[in-house]
Curated annotation (Swiss-Prot):
Residues 61-67, 126-148 are extracellular. This is Secretory carrier-associated membrane protein 5. The lineage of its organism: Eukaryota, Metazoa, Chordata, Craniata, Vertebrata. The keyword Membrane applies. Residues 1-39, 89-102, 170-235 are cytoplasmic. One of its GO terms (biological process) is positive regulation of calcium ion-dependent exocytosis. One of its GO terms (molecular function) is protein-containing complex binding. Its main location: membrane. Interacts (via C-terminal part) with SYT1 and SYT2; interaction with synaptotagmins making a link with the SNARE molecules. Interacts with SLC9A7. It comes from Rattus norvegicus. Belongs to the SCAMP family. SCAMP5 subfamily.
Length: 235
């Protein structure tokens, strides 16, 4: 079996760094979980883009007469939250759907709830916190309308991220509870060390993929058991 080579993030060749993770949705994720996993990945991308747009909004805030603190913090949030959100909540849910790991699901719930709280705070927009939220944007309309209009763009995006994050958390929680997952199951994985055993993870992945393949082939198997009748042409 060929060794999997890390391919994410896809860095340009002139950067003297190598990708840190291997990511292949079609190869790793069972078909029944593929759509939800990709949606969570797109949510991470939207959050990263929003942080970049927020940096532009804070630059307009600075040019319009705001303090430099917000711009500095916006830059810090961009370089900090983009990789941390990928490592802390997307990789756990990717691994959870890949290996059906309750421990990974619990890690996702813990970190993603923190992500949801952060998204709400960003949408609110407390002045001096480096985010163009509603409070900061609305209050700046009286100072510089042009800058406030630019600030309104990341404000709306932060709001969308917060709403989508709540929906995503609800969807994953509903799936996890419906599949029989529980906190005690995650504790059992932690105690036995199954969450970090590559052989157990591979077996779980193969079982999940096999179950998905069996579900897809079930109608074909059902029809294959129908008796075949042959008739002789001789009279």
């Amino acid at each position: 079996m060929a060794e999997k080579v890390n391919n994410f993030p896809p860095l340009p060749k002139f950067i003297p760094l190598k990708p840190c993770f291997y990511q292949d949705f079609e190869a790793d994720i069972p078909p029944q979980h593929l759509s939800l996993t990709k949606r969570l990945y797109y949510l991470w991308m939207l959050n990263s883009v929003t942080l970049a747009v927020n940096l532009v909004g804070c630059l307009a805030w600075l040019i319009g007469g705001g303090g430099a603190t917000n711009f500095g913090l916006a830059f810090l949030w961009l370089i900090l939250f983009t990789p941390c959100s990928y490592v802390c909540w997307f990789r756990p849910i990717y691994k959870a759907f890949k290996t059906d790991s309750s421990f990974s699901f619990m890690a996702f719930f813990f970190t993603f709830m923190a992500q949801l709280v952060i998204s709400i705070i960003q949408a609110v927009g407390i002045p001096g916190w480096g985010v163009c939220g509603w409070i900061a944007t609305i209050s700046f309309f009286g100072t510089n309308i042009g800058s406030a209009v630019v600030m309104l763009i990341p404000t709306v995006m932060f709001t969308v991220v917060a709403v989508f994050s709540f929906i995503a958390l609800s969807m994953v929680h509903k799936f996890y509870r419906g599949s029989g997952g529980s906190f005690s199951k995650a504790q059992e994985e932690w105690t036995t060390g199954a969450w970090k055993n590559p052989h157990v993870q591979q077996a779980a992945q193969n079982a999940a993929m096999g179950a998905a393949q069996g579900a897809m082939n079930q109608p074909q198997t059902q029809y294959s058991t129908t008796p075949n009748y042959t008739y002789s042409n001789e009279m």
